[in-house]
């Protein structure tokens, strides 16, 4: 009786069963993430998949979220060159809009503020970078607006995870990824 009560109380306070039902699987290139059911998964295109994790700020370029990028998006990064871990990721050519405020442009390259290796499921390590990117006017005047860009790159799996909103849950979700 006491053991049953302790186990029941433990499940009640940890939320373990509720947590598993509050997620859904997202599979990309053999990697499966368990993401919250409330997150919206976009259609895959040549750049990858946009996963919307929250609301859409009025001035933001797009809704809060992150991208799962495959080989095509990795090979055609900034100015048509392959992704280079020595720079922030920017798909395409030309100026990049400032993520939190579309009135401005991203002032690349920004400042590297963290680097290392991070686990993405068992047996997979990603090259990890965090860049602080400032925003400027079209005439290159600084604005005081900035954002952080986090990148997990798995070169062997040809996956790049690109987060411009510093989602607090994403790191843990990636650590718990499974592979097929």
What are these regions (language model features)?
Residues 1-63, 147, 153-180:
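N-terminal targeting sequences that direct proteins away from the cytosol to non-cytosolic compartments
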Residues 45-168:
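Conserved polar/disulfide-associated segments of primarily extracytoplasmic proteins
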């Amino acid at each position: 009786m006491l053991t049953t009560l302790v186990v029941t109380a433990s499940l009640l306070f940890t939320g373990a069963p509720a947590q598993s039902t509050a997620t859904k699987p997202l599979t990309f290139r053999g990697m499966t993430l368990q993401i919250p059911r409330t997150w919206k998964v976009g259609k895959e295109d040549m750049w990858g998949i946009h996963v919307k994790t929250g609301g859409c700020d009025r001035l933001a370029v797009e809704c809060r979220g992150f991208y799962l990028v495959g080989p095509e998006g990795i090979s055609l990064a900034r100015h048509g060159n392959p992704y280079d871990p020595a720079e922030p990721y920017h798909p395409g050519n030309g100026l990049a809009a400032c993520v939190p405020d579309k009135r401005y442009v991203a002032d690349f390259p920004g400042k590297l503020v963290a680097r290392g290796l991070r686990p993405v499921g068992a047996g997979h390590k990603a090259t990890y970078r965090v860049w602080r990117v400032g925003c400027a006017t079209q005439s290159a005047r600084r604005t005081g607006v900035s954002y952080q860009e986090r990148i997990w790159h798995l070169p062997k799996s040809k996956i790049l995870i690109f987060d411009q909103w510093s989602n607090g849950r994403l790191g843990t979700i990636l650590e718990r990824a499974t592979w097929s």
